[in-house]
């Protein structure tokens, strides 16, 4: 029986220069694997707690030495000797060991790092790729990437209110071709922005961060880039938004679009989106309303839920209980999946299974603070999520996930690229 021999953690750096945890697990056959935990910029208030040191003399208070120490002492002590391939049992032990609903004691960053490293070590010991270990024989589907090519909001220091303007390459036969087309659109967009004397510096997730007069102009220039690159807008490459509305809302559920000097209530903001959807081939809107604006979400879902994908990120924070509430209230029709919002691989799996059971789409997602770790690429294929958000075709921490997906596609001798079939379920 494979058991856990050792567990340890190290403070390393993420893509924004902030500290994060690298956890390592060694098994009884001396197999070793590590995992690096990501971190978000715009975070939902109900996310599992990321433990920081708050020592202002180190990393402006963002150090993670306490979380590392929790791995190196408490977690290590309780996990040594446990069966390695029983992921659910080990993850449940981690949850019980913490004793809070949001990992406030040990830190979700400490717990997730160990959970990820354990899955990777077990797969390695069994000589299986991670996607096959987690997903079994049914892990065959390459996800449609949602590439963030213009950044705004908290991901960029510019005048755009919406956090992400994305492209989705739906009309292709393979992941490789879809990614190639996306990269060509990205480079074409850069030339267009250069021609408009716009900034082509990039945001946290590799997208450009130009200044525009309103929130419509990015849709226009992206549409131009798609067509100039030689692709059919809406047919081969569609558009998607992450509004990150929780960053725009006040206590009265009024939404402040500072770039346009507008203040809109929930119904007015939904009407604003409907104009966008009528004019542009937008197939997905994420966090269109605040995480606390459940009434507004119900209206948004009623108005647009049959036309496009409505993704809950801050709304659900990868939490099965919150997702169940959304299901019961007919709110949204898709969920963003971020393992560090919930704490362990097993809890993430539970949420994905619940979503799939109720025909909610799942979008595997990175965070704005990432690393070279490509775990989510395998995870997306393992669970056949059908979609993945992992940034633009720039910045190596984003490219690491795309390169891993290319590798998986090759191993699967093509696999199945879901493409246009993604939105034909209903």
Swiss-Prot record:
GO molecular function per UniProt: magnesium ion binding; phosphopyruvate hydratase activity
Subcellular location: Cytoplasm; Secreted; Cell surface
E.C. number: 4.2.1.11
Cited CDD domains: enolase
Keywords linked to the UniProt accession: Cytoplasm, Glycolysis, Lyase, Magnesium, Metal-binding, Secreted
Catalytic activity: (2R)-2-phosphoglycerate = phosphoenolpyruvate + H2O
Binding site for (2R)-2-phosphoglycerate: 163, 338, 367-368, 389
Stretches of the chain forming a coiled coil according to its record: none
Enzyme class, first EC level, given as a word: lyase
InterPro entries: Enolase, Enolase-like_C_sf, Enolase-like_N, Enolase_C, Enolase_CS, Enolase_N
Pathway: Carbohydrate degradation; glycolysis; pyruvate from D-glyceraldehyde 3-phosphate: step 4/5
Active site: 205, 338
GO biological process: glycolytic process
Binding residues annotated for Mg(2+), in chain numbering: 242, 286, 313
Keyword Iron-sulfur listed: no
Coarse class of the protein's main subcellular location: cytoplasm
One Pfam family hit: Enolase_N
HAMAP family tied to this protein: Enolase
Similarity annotation: Belongs to the enolase family.
PANTHER family: ENOLASE
Protein's job: Catalyzes the reversible conversion of 2-phosphoglycerate (2-PG) into phosphoenolpyruvate (PEP). It is essential for the degradation of carbohydrates via glycolysis.
Protein name in the entry: Enolase
Organism the protein comes from: Helicobacter pylori (strain Shi470)
